[in-house]
Amino acid sequence: LKLPFKIRDYQFDAVCTGIQRKNAILLSPTGSGKSLIIYVLMRYLISSFEQDVLVIVPTTSLVEQMYNDFKTYGYDVEKYCHRIYSGKDKNTTKRIIISTWQSIYRFQPDWFSRFGTVFGDECHGFKSKSLTTIMNKCVEAEYRFGTTGTLDGALTHELVLQGLFG
């Protein structure tokens, strides 16, 4: 990957867990490099499979942050990544889509069929009906990962997340 820095052991362990399990909730504290974990997993999967990758984040600022993080890691984001949020084009042939959930939850199920991998950043927010609807439309996504720095501790919430991400 030619990263500009060394990946930490716990990040490497999270990536290995993701590859082995295919579905996982990756719990890691704020500031621990969750975007790097997403990036390394994404790069592995995009090079190993033909299906595209969807990265869902809660806000437009996080769309930009994730995009810029990938750029910082040395990725050609202009060539491979597309951002979707208010005012951005919803159609693209780029293989990696970074979007807010609000921008895509009303899309038809066939729009989601191209994705073999889905990342839900800040997945503790995925208990909402809109986010659950998105995940249920991603029927082709063999790989599903949720990342979060916190789980709220409610058993019902944890079971919903396990159902969506593994």
Predicted regions and their residues:
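The Walker A (P-loop) glycine that initiates the GxxxxGKT/S ATP-binding motif of P-loop NTPases
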Residues: 28, 122
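Hydrophobic positions in the central parallel beta-sheet of the AAA+
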Residues: 26, 55, 97-99, 110, ...
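Inter-Walker segment of RecA-like/P-loop motor cores
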Residues: 71-109
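Conserved nucleotide-binding/hydrolysis micro-motifs of P-loop NTPases
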Residues: 60-62, 89, 103-105, 124-125, ...
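Conserved Walker A/P-loop ATP-binding site and its immediately adjacent core
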Residues: 32-72, 131, 153
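Post-DEXD/H (motif II) to motif III coupling segment of the RecA-like Helicase ATP-binding lobe
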Residues: 116-117, 124-166
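Conserved pre-motif I regulatory segment
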Residues: 1-27
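Structural beta-sheet core signal
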Residues: 55-56, 83, 146
